[in-house]
Amino acid sequence: MKNTTAMADYELRHIEALRKNLAGCTVLLKKDGNFPLEKPCALAAYGSGVRRTIRGGTGSGEVNSRYSVTIEEGLQQAGFTLTGMEWHTGYEQARKKAHKAFLKQLKKDAKAVNQNFILYGMGKAMPEPEYNLPLNAEGDAAIYVVSRISGEGNDRTPLKGDIRLTDSEVRDILALDKKFTRFMLVLNVGGVVDLTPVMGVRNILLLSQLGVETGGALADILLGKANPSGKLTTTWAAFEEYPEMPDFEDMNETRYREGIYVGYRYFDTFRKQALFPFGYGLSYTEFRLGAVAVEANGAQITVRTSVENIGALAGRQVVQVYLSKPAGKLDAPWQELCAFAKTRELAPGETESVTCSFTLPEMAAYDTETASYILEAGNYIVRVGVSSVETAPAAVLHLDKTVTTLQANNVLGSTDFTDLTAPAATMERPAGVPVIEIDPAAIACETVAYDRIEEVLPEVDALTKEDAALLLIGDFDPNAKGFASMIGTAGRHVCGAAGESCDKISGFPFLIMADGPAGLRLAKEYYEDDKGKHAVGSTAMPASLQEMLSGPMKLVMSLMGGSGKPKPGCEIKTQYCTAIPIGTALAQSFDLAFVEQCGDIVGEEMERFGVHLWLAPALNIHRSIRCGRNFEYYSEDPLVSGKMAAAMTRGVQAHKGCGTTIKHYAANNKEYNRTRNNSIVSERAMREIYLKGFGICVREAQPKAVMTSYNLLNGTHTAESRGLIMDILRAEFGYEGIVMTDWVSPITGDARSAHRDSQAQYVAAAGGDLFMPGNKGDYDNLLQGIDSGAVTLEQVKINASRVVRMARALTQE
């Protein structure tokens, strides 16, 4: 609950900036004209999300903010009289019983596979329970709020209570829609839920998970103070309609057999039926697109149109431009998003001119046979509209011969299968649209210098082998074991931080890192004594972890994390951070300016609390709706993902001494056994889908750091892949920052795995700069690698020089 009298000025400013933009992150999926409401009224409020509102997912995505407004609180603050509150008393009883059984089974399952209960249960969400409670409340309108949560460490399931609705939910939603003239189904979810059984409901709002003001945002929308203007960045469909992924649950190998046909690329090309397609979203008002003009200036394509608000309420619209490419040597999806733009808020009757642009080389396909990006000869159809299924052809770009846009190298290994390919089809040239000839000579072929030489700083060159190696390992306590080894020396200088680089060498600055991606996660309260900084109680511990622990275990974990009870008279200091919307919700806004503003909020709080690197944003692709961390990620589309990550990075890095860490590079699209699972992906799919967003972010915003993923790629750990790090990231994308690992620890892997964890010596040899969080074993491994020749001392010092340069740049030393 909000208590503004206790809040600092920065908190109030940040919350105000967020609140007025949150409706832009929500997606109105269905409407019948009965919303918005004219004024606050008696509202029958049902569903777990009314009182147990989810503001974001679990794991690294959790944020320790001062408060969070539930939907119940937000509606009451807005003046609604809520009815049906006795339903929630009954629901809590059913949930408590189910949760007790859930934890009991979780402990049993962990024991059966000889795993630590806490690590085994990380990210596992209890399915919604079944219940049988009366719906006897009256009111002028009604809502039912479906909530789902997921998180780091585990994936979702296609079961009732998770991806599917429970029988209880379906029964009550349909009953309420029948009983009330004004009924809204509200989805307080971070990922796709199969809505097949309730598609007859007249009003559906994807509220998503919007951070601290989630409840207030819904009140604004119901009352028409704010108008939903988001668009889906992931295709919503019945679970059976998505591509089959038979080895998604395989412990060791995950084969990306669908190739480039991910999300709408699959649905459009293979004529699959979506419930709600990519790019889709309604508004309380109506819009009309004007005439479309397409121009070509060499390889630069510019699309101009206008948007008119022809409805009765103010609102915003998103113009989307898609490109259908010719299928020749390479097959091609039916269409791919190539540009988008969002209008300002338009009053009824108001019109705005909109311009979108892209370059043809940005849309090139990767030919593995020639190791090059190519644009094949033929017709390129430009489609313009307001969703992936609501477009019209606007122009045909004709290229009379195939051109190469970039000559690369195949560096990612091979697969043991052939990618899914599109059925042979001839795309007819649409009638009545202009044909624009593209001069092949105007499309330059980019060359890449893969053998660039990097200098070693003289002061680093003068270091001993032992000291140079220290700079590549996250700061560690040589005596730490178990959980303590997993978190390194996190929080020594900033309480609740996720990790630090080495501070053991005089004259060399160090970096402080904090988790995200929905804001900074730091200890809310801490105190200092002669032994350092300590979190008060469990204020540094994620709420999802606290829920799983008994009282004694909470105490043990708090003490291990440096938490404790301050002595009388000790000053208690605070680090309240703002929880911004989850990544998927931000992307649904299609509002780059707002995403950059969110980055500005995070950057200001980083400056305030002394954090150099934010371990975010995360821009992995929504390959499967089962991925437990999809809420952190932006989209199934790499253009959206890259643009959003770049906007967030610009906002953060506008602040002195602050940088982002884009992650997880790459092909980290499931959580089960993530540290030792091998993603088997074709070079083409990697480059066109899973790496493309990273390239966009690097070229547009140059994040200070990149975090590799836990998984292997075609048999090699991503953190140990020189092709990924040096050839593609640095040489092709032009990356200038540092590369770190994800938080590797031997206690997080499943002992039954066929693959090992990544190792510091091989990470360094691949050009990785920081092995995180760091422990004595990692340091010894690196020294052994130097002695054995697995990594040269010169490479270690090159990597160390990059770390030192970045630390100096961010600490201003």
Show the residue positions of the predicted features.
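Extracellular/periplasmic metallocenter environments
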Residues: 371
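Short beta-strand elements
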Residues: 390-407
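Glycoside hydrolase catalytic-domain context in secreted enzymes
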Residues: 1-365, 374-390, 407-813
